Amino acid sequence: MDLFKMLGQFKDMQGRMQTMQEEMSQRTFSALAGGGLVTADVDGKMQLKRIKLDASVVNPGDIEMLEDLIVVAVAEAQKKAADAMQMELQKVTGGIDLPFKLPF
């Protein structure tokens, strides 16, 4: 294969990856914990954007349970974002596994 052609394809893939990253950063991924008592929203960069608590879960006598529910909801929302990013990345790269971890 022609080296210049390969470099051109790589440059094209870089552009598509940048576009995909920008699009993903605009998406929101939500997850529930405790049967919907805690909701966490993260963006496509896996940054926490919102925590929503049902009033019934706020019990001063059981803060540990609330903390656990928040951790579960955030982790699940981040997993959804990571899974979506992986799917989009597979589309951009044509299924080629990249030998490095992307910073998002």
Swiss-Prot record:
Gene3D superfamilies, per the entry: Nucleoid-associated protein YbaB-like domain
Domain of life of the source: Bacteria
Pfam families: YbaB_DNA_bd
GO molecular function annotations of the record: DNA binding
Transmembrane residue ranges: none
Presence of keyword GTP-binding: no
UniProt keyword DNA-binding, yes or no: yes
Annotated Gene Ontology cellular component terms: bacterial nucleoid; cytosol
Keywords linked to the UniProt accession: Cytoplasm, DNA-binding
Subcellular location: Cytoplasm, Nucleoid
Subunit structure: Homodimer.
PANTHER family referenced in this protein's UniProt entry, alphabetically: NUCLEOID-ASSOCIATED PROTEIN YBAB
Similarity comment: Belongs to the YbaB/EbfC family.
Known function: Binds to DNA and alters its conformation. May be involved in regulation of gene expression, nucleoid organization and DNA protection.
Protein's name according to its UniProt entry: Nucleoid-associated protein GAU_1113
Annotated organism of origin: Gemmatimonas aurantiaca (strain DSM 14586 / JCM 11422 / NBRC 100505 / T-27)
